Amino acid sequence: MNIQALINDKVSQALEAAGAPTGSPAAVRQSAKPQFGDYQANGVMGVAKQLGTNPREFAQKVLDVLDLDGIASKTEIAGPGFINIFLSEEFLAKQAEAALADPRLGVASEEAQTIVADYSAPNVAKEMHVGHLRSTIIGDAVVRTLEFLGHKVIRANHIGDWGTQFGMLIANLERVQQESGEVSMELADLEGFYRESKKLYDEDEEFAVKARGYVVKLQSGDEFCAEMWKKLVDVTMIQNQRNYDRLNVSLSRDDVMGESMYNDMLPKIVADLKAQGLAVEDDGAQVVFLEEFKNKDGEPMGVIVQKRDGGFLYTTTDIACAKYRYEELGADRVLYFIDSRQHQHLMQAWTIVRKAGYVPESVSLEHHAFGMMLGKDGKPFKTRAGGTVRLADLLDEAEVRAAQLIESKNPELAEDEKKAIANTVAMAAVKYADLSKHRTTDYVFDWDNMLAFEGNTAPYMQYAYTRVASVFAKAGVSMDDLQGEIKITDEKEKALIAKLMQFEEAVQSVAREGQPHIMCSYLFELAGQFSSFYEACPILVAEDEAVKQSRLKLAALTAKTIKQGLSLLGIDTLERM
């Protein structure tokens, strides 16, 4: 149950009954401090100002008609007109019992929408690097959360599989095959192969002419060029899938919807934009001038949708892409996990999409932008030599460092168990370090911080789960086979349950805002509440059996909540570390 939403509805009804205009926001929030209750309604003051009345007097009118029977034990007016709400112990205990009995931990399914999530999007014939990490793991965490809530999510891996560079790549692939027969390439070779192709293109005019010819042939559907192009795509995606599998990312080859998918739509889009009077010829190119965006002279900004030579641009592809996602996929929401530097480009494409009537306003187009990964020097994260860090190399180093950490913490474990634990911790550490940060900010990549067992880190959260789960091994019982009822006998128990009951709020916030750090913060706070409870409230040596069973139930609900929350982030838990 989303208790915040429940109370918000109750306060909204009371506001209206007290004379507030229909639809006035109740603005119910989790209280920042225990002395202000569990929730606080902050909407009274805005309404009082609107009505020209005293906020505290109006707050009292709201309280007089506020029905929180069976939910709150106390309500009070604080400060200039806040309403503090204290949940009753009986209500909390009842909700905790219901959550523990529910495989979904009390999280309700939402009315299903069709949601397209555009994330990861590496380029063909290049290896994934650290710059692809944020889109890949942030997008995947949000996708998992949306699916948990019951939505139909279509993963769209919008790979860069088209463009003039394929002419030189195909020409070079043909050269290599003629010299040495059939070529079997790993992507590590393709990185060098790409550089070699570019060098030949820049320095060998005969090669460059052939490459440009192959661009035209590829675009016109030539069979040989199409075969070579497919080989480049296949080799790339096989290697990318290894990274996805290592990171426990839910993308597969079936989710690839590359730029090339929209090629046939592009001429029709430009023709339609011209017919609608949106695109006009300017210096031989087809341009859409947008009043919503100004150039440096304060004039409407021109967005090119077709070049003078007839070629199309990324903007044209993105217009077609949005149109396809609405018309063919039936999207209610489209989420783009693309870095913040692309914001203006997306806004321009979407403005054209709306003006042309390709996607109605009822469909939400959302740019879930993210910042950069920085090194300790505050500059973009690079190798020591100043090069781009390959994602596979980063994951390899994470596993080595995690193995050293596990060896120092638990050297007596069997080697295969140490390796399995290290791999799980390594991938979790890399992902959680990113997911725990607000996605719009840049963040500093720091091995020591991300592998620490203190603070808001993956090792800390994984250990928190292991610690809670170990209670049941010591008690000799299963967390799925507990007796008795949950009864609150201590303030720390109440505080723990109150935090546990905020799980649905965290899940819904991640889904609504595309911000996985909300879940990380929630889980970290939950682990802290459990530590306080564990220190103050003995479980295995509780004063009587009923209290022991009640506290075991709270431990079980905590373990299940941490496990489910981490799972939504694409992070595995461990039974021991």
Curated annotation (Swiss-Prot):
GO molecular function: arginine-tRNA ligase activity; ATP binding
Catalytic reaction equation(s): tRNA(Arg) + L-arginine + ATP = L-arginyl-tRNA(Arg) + AMP + diphosphate
Annotated compartments: Cytoplasm
Keywords on record: Aminoacyl-tRNA synthetase, ATP-binding, Cytoplasm, Ligase, Nucleotide-binding, Protein biosynthesis
Subcellular location, principal: cytoplasm
Position of sequence motif 'HIGH' region: 122-132
Subunit structure: Monomer.
Protein name in UniProt: Arginine--tRNA ligase
Organism: Vibrio vulnificus (strain YJ016)
